[in-house]
Amino acid sequence: MGKIKVESCEIEGLKVITPTVFGDERGYFMETYNYNDFKEAGIDVQFIQDNQSASKKGVLRGLHFQINYPQDKLVRVVNGEVFDVAVDLREGSKTYGKWFGVLLSAENKKQFFIPKNFAHGFIVLSDYAEFAYKCTDFYHPNDEGGLYFDDPEIGVEWPMPEGMTKEDLIISEKDHKWGGIKDLKK
């Protein structure tokens, strides 16, 4: 039906996708995923799991990845606003350890395609956010890996939600315990 606009990012493989939105006095309609359109844009993957999470302002989730069952992901915000981040973990990549971030919101309707072998995370900037993501492999809880969100070797520049500092962020105990990128080599 509608075509998509695909923007390449500074890190090869990452893509910011803007769908065509059809709107009138009733509201709007958009295709969030069309295999043929994505394939034509160079994103030829088959998604097999669809997830959605809800979080309040100041929640930071990540940085997560799967070790033996890596996933391509297509992420978007259904309600609210987040700053979404991907970190390149591809062995031999010239951008290994580099990060890229993009503002995703219900208003801008942008989506972020993250290939396999990237760590992924986001911080909620609005009062509330619903986050949806498609994956090319199932979630394997015993295969999960992660990086500490504030690893100085990576240097993600997380924007802080209005009225909050880093100390106010809501981060799971597990996400606080992840090591840095140097620990992945061990």
Identify the function of each model-found stretch:
Residues 112, 120-125, 133:
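Short beta-strand His + acidic residue motifs that chelate non-heme Fe in jelly-roll/DSBH
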